[in-house]
Amino acid sequence: MPRSLKKGPFVDQHLYLKVLAENEKGSKNVIKTWSRRSMIIPDMLGHTIAVHDGRKHVPVFVTESMVGHKLGEFAPTRTFRGHVKDDKKGKRR
């Protein structure tokens, strides 16, 4: 069930303040965050936000099509190594 429109998007306060500070300065420095639950808002457009995936920070460049999604959607936490291939042709009994 989506969030109520009257509540508005959720953005962690510390992340929002960092984005506003970068907008005031007019600079586009990388902003590090652990807040995967924060929603991408139009104020973040053009910024690179380094989202923590559990072991490192993944840089995410925010574009217009990302607005309304959460930051964690763009930093995968699991790595898929592939299934083990059964090589039955090469084995002899």
Curated annotation (Swiss-Prot):
SUPFAM superfamilies: Ribosomal protein S19 (SSF54570). The keyword Ribosomal protein applies. Keywords: Ribonucleoprotein, Ribosomal protein, RNA-binding, rRNA-binding. It comes from the Bacteria. The keyword RNA-binding applies. GO terms for biological process: ribosomal small subunit assembly; translation. One of its GO terms (cellular component) is small ribosomal subunit. Gene3D superfamilies: 30s Ribosomal Protein S19, Chain A. InterPro entries: Ribosomal_uS19, Ribosomal_uS19_bac-type, Ribosomal_uS19_CS, Ribosomal_uS19_SF. PROSITE patterns: RIBOSOMAL_S19 (PS00323). Pfam families: Ribosomal_S19. One of its GO terms (molecular function) is rRNA binding. NCBIfam families: rpsS_bact. Protein S19 forms a complex with S13 that binds strongly to the 16S ribosomal RNA. Belongs to the universal ribosomal protein uS19 family. This is Small ribosomal subunit protein uS19. The gene is rpsS.
